[in-house]
Amino acid sequence: MLAGVLLLVEWRVKVHFPGMWALVSFTAAAFLLERSGSNLRFETKGSTSFVVHLAGTVLFGGLWGAVIAGCSTVLSELDQRKSAIKVLFNTSQRIVAVAGSFAIVRLLGAATPMFDFTPGVPLIVTDVQRNSLLYLLFAVLYFAFNTTAVSLVVAWSSGSRFREIWNLTFRG
């Protein structure tokens, strides 16, 4: 439900449609990275698809970054024949991580896209520095949302304490 609310919030922010080619390319890249992931503890899997999720959000904004993350996650989960509840959770968790963290940095003043390369528009150093720091915060929040959601669900489903799962997650 939170994923849907965040998508609706991001939808209300007027951001240009990046085009089907960009969305399909980013979704395919994230899907392929997800497929090449590695197995972790507690029947979880890690991948580098987050790079594409973050890049898509930096370039296209919170809505389209969340769409890329959601679509690539659904495709990957279905390809791996995961149960419906895992597909729903993993997809929602990625959408919340992208849209939620981007909503926070947008409220703090982050620009979309991060840099404006329009001919004739100068890059202002203070804007570049501010946006760089805000997008660094975006990445930190993305991982915080993601790790917290996974740790909570793994702790709940395994009967372990959240703190124990959280510590094991960071130790690898």
How would you label these PLM feature ranges?
Residues 1-172:
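Short helix-perturbing small/polar motifs within transmembrane alpha-helices
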